[in-house]
C-alpha cells in the first residue's frame, strides 16, 4: 500500500508535467485516492495488531513481500517471490507443513491463480489437517473485464484485508 501511494504520486506528477492545464485535477485526484489508501492502511495495521498470528504461510509463489514488510509480518512460502517454479519439493512441503504445526497456523494462503495443489499438499501433511486454504489476490491476472466489473486496487486490497484477518486469527 505504501509503495502504491508513492507510485500514484509519481504518476500524478508526470501527468501534471505532460498536461499542465489539468495539473490541479491530477493533484486533487491523487490526494483523494491517497486518503483512501491511508484509511485502508490503517485498517491493515489494526487487523495485524488484533490478530493472534504474526506469521503467514503461502503454499504458492510469494508476490506479497511488500505487504508483509509494511505490516511487520513474518512469512514462509513455497517459492521466493514470483518464481516460475510450480512444483514444490518434498523438502519444501514437509518444512512448510512443520511450520504450520509449530506455529499452530489455522490458514494456508495461496494466490488467485493457484490450482490449490501445493496448499492442499501442505495441509495434508500437517498433524491436524484442518487448516483453511485462503486466497490473496496479487492483482497479476486482472483483466479488462474485471476492471469493467468494478475491480480496482482499493477493492482488491479491501478483499485481501478480509482474507488477511482470517489468516491471522
Where in the sequence are the language-model features?
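Extracytoplasmic metal-acquisition and chelation regions
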Residues: 1-169
Amino acid at each position: 500500500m505504501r509503495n502504491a501511494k508513492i507510485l500514484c504520486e509519481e504518476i500524478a506528477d508526470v501527468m501534471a508535467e505532460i498536461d499542465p492545464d489539468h495539473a490541479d485535477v491530477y493533484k486533487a485526484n491523487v490526494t483523494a485516492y491517497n486518503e483512501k489508501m491511508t484509511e485502508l492502511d490503517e485498517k491493515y495495521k489494526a487487523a495485524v495488531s488484533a490478530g493472534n498470528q504474526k506469521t503467514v504461510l503461502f503454499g504458492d509463489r510469494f508476490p506479497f513481500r511488500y505487504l508483509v514488510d509494511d505490516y511487520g509480518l513474518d512469512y514462509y512460502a513455497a517459492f521466493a517471490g514470483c518464481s516460475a517454479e510450480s512444483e514444490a519439493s518434498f523438502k519444501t512441503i514437509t518444512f512448510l507443513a512443520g511450520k504450520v504445526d509449530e506455529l499452530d497456523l489455522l490458514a494456508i494462503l495461496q494466490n488467485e491463480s493457484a490450482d490449490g495443489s501445493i496448499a492442499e499438499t501442505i495441509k495434508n501433511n500437517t498433524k491436524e489437517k484442518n487448516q483453511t486454504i485462503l486466497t490473496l489476490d496479487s492483482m497479476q491476472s486482472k483483466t479488462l473485464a474485471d476492471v469493467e466489473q468494478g475491480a480496482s486496487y482499493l477493492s482488491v486490497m479491501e478483499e485481501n484485508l478480509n482474507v488477511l484477518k482470517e489468516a491471522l486469527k
